């Protein structure tokens, strides 16, 4: 099938075809076929609706400032407003660089720290405080979720409708804004999209950024290695890994240097574990 002609789910999957009877039955075989744009539009609408529902489900926590036992009993806990004060964002401190006496440093990798700092800069627009910080990050993470859905749909062609499965994932309701994971998820989706377009160099850059946001994308390199071995694409794989390493270093080395051995090490992201070794040896 041409990659420009989308796969119709109701014609490709018997279970989906059976379920479609509720909403009008499978598409007719003589129906006009799309090119994938409609699938991405529908996925976008579903993603926006699902994300809005996810935020609405956190209304009990938002109404009481994410305090009290209700954040657990209502399943609406989030690290984001809690860490606003505990990690120094409320005091204008920068992650990894400004030591907070008696408190742990920001425990996420460097790119996630930068992302959270952007949220801190936007917080006054949303009224300030932990709730304002949460609102700013909801906006930023919503953009990440849309990028994830659209990149997945574009990479999955001609199965563009598969993006709707991601957009409507039940896990979104409970996990979308627990912390900043959607940043790494979005970067991972863009990485796979660029790889599918046979752009290993740029794919590696985005992979490096994804690893600088969260370490789990590194785990996906194992299956990617096996696929490249099977398809004789090892040259592209090593090019991707090389640019990934450069991108990761470009993000982390400046922070390592600024958090120099002459300053007290702030425990936090495992990304900066090398700095702890430098400080202890100094």
Functional labels for PLM-detected ranges:
Residues 219-246:
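Perimembrane helix-loop-helix junctions
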Residues 194-209, 242:
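Short hydrophobic alpha-helices at membrane interfaces in multi-pass membrane enzymes
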Residues 151, 184-199:
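Specific aromatic-rich, kink-prone transmembrane helix
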Residues 205-227, 250:
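Transmembrane helices and adjacent periplasmic/lumenal helix-loop junctions
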Residues 237-282:
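Membrane-lumen/periplasm interface segments of specific transmembrane helices
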Residues 2-156:
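TM-lumen/periplasm interface segments of multi-pass membrane proteins
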Residues 150-169:
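Transmembrane-helix signature of polytopic, membrane-embedded enzymes
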Residues 176-184:
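Short acidic/glycine- and proline-prone juxtamembrane loop motifs at membrane-interface regions
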């Amino acid at each position: 099938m041409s990659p420009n002609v989308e796969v119709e789910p109701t014609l490709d999957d018997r279970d989906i075809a059976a379920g479609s009877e509720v909403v009008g039955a499978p598409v007719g075989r003589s129906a006009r076929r799309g090119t994938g744009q409609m699938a991405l539009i529908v996925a976008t609408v579903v993603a926006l609706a699902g994300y809005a529902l996810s935020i609405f489900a956190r209304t009990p926590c938002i109404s009481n400032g994410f305090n009290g036992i209700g954040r657990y009993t209502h399943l609406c806990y989030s690290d984001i407003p809690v860490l606003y004060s505990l990690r120094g964002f409320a005091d204008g401190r920068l992650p990894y660089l400004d030591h907070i006496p008696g408190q742990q440093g920001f425990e996420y990798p460097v790119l996630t720290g930068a992302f959270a700092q952007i949220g801190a800069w936007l917080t006054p627009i949303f009224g300030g405080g932990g709730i304002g910080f949460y609102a700013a990050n909801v906006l930023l993470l919503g953009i990440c979720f849309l990028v994830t859905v659209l990149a997945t749909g574009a990479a999955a062609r001609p199965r563009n409708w598969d993006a709707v499965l991601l957009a409507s994932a039940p896990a979104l309701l409970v996990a979308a804004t627990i912390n900043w994971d959607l940043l790494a998820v979005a970067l991972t989706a863009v990485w796979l999209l660029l790889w599918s377009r046979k752009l290993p160099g740029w794919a590696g850059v985005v992979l490096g950024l994804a690893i600088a946001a969260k370490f789990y994308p590194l785990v996906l390199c194992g299956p990617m290695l096996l696929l490249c071995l099977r398809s004789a694409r090892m040259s592209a794989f090593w090019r991707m890994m090389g640019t990934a390493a450069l991108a990761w270093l470009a993000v982390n080395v400046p922070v390592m240097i600024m958090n120099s051995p002459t300053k007290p090490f702030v425990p936090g992201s495992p990304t900066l574990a090398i700095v702890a070794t430098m400080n202890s040896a100094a």
